[in-house]
Amino acid sequence: MNAMEQCPVCGKRGIFKQVCYDPTAVFYECPVCGRYEYSMENNAYEELDYNELAPFLFYEGFRNQQGRVEHRYYSTKSREWCDTYTVEFRNDKNIAEMPVHMDQKIISLWFPKSFSQKVDMILIKLNELTEFVGQEIKLDIPSLLSCMFVRRFKLDNRETVEDKELVKQALYMTSYLFEIGYVKGINCINGDVSRADSYYGEISITPKGYDRIDQLQQRDNDGKDVLVAMRFGSETLKLREAIREGIFEAGYHAIFIDEVEHNGFITPELLSRIKRVDLLLLT
């Protein structure tokens, strides 16, 4: 059964929800959070910190793009299930999709640990949202809150924070971007924040902002990523899991090449990953 409803992570209205092939799972497709699945087969989805999950999906989510169908989606099902299902997909044994496991440990490792890290990530993301230098940027409210790492929920009981406080958090971050000269334009929200047609901006990145982006890209902002190339199949699942755990315990983030959509070819996305990682592991 398909339906349109509100995204449980970011609050975007009118998103796609699907409950069909697995009665214990719910699949969502949101323009802000991308494609993701909650599974009730374990308690992983209950352990997710939504204050970290919303930015994670906004920055790292899988979305269909013009001229390209995205098969990947995040899932709270076990790593073993996701890996096995992906093997079947690649071997044409199912016609569905390619699940990529996510849990709170993965999200927490990704989440920025300092204010300056957040600022750098925001600037890089704003640049990714543009097609050309100097393009003006408008963000709907769910996108703004996720982009600015706004805490939507109180820590003790998951009660939602009032709209007034959400706006205050978001504008604090954007005001700093204006103050240090990284962006210019209109630093305000247009319309009632509770309305679906309200939006932030328009803003654009300044020459100083682009200079900072160049510095970050040269510094290699993916330095915590380890790209892993290995034989992929059910017989390597235990080894794969051991490699993932070892990389995580060392404080890094494992990216397996099969989790990067490439269809057997060196695509721009895959080539970009190879260029930007500090460590490439071949097994």
Region spans (language model):
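Cysteine-rich micro-motifs
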Residues: 23-37
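Conserved beta-strand-loop-alpha-helix hinge of the TIR/SEFIR fold
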Residues: 273-283
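Conserved BB-loop
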Residues: 244-270
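Short cysteine-rich clusters marking metal-coordination/redox-active sites
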Residues: 7-11, 30-33
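Cys/His-rich microdomains that often coordinate metals
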Residues: 14-15, 34-37, 200
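Accessory beta->alpha helical hairpin/"wing" motif in late/C-terminal subdomains of nucleic-acid enzymes
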Residues: 39, 185-216
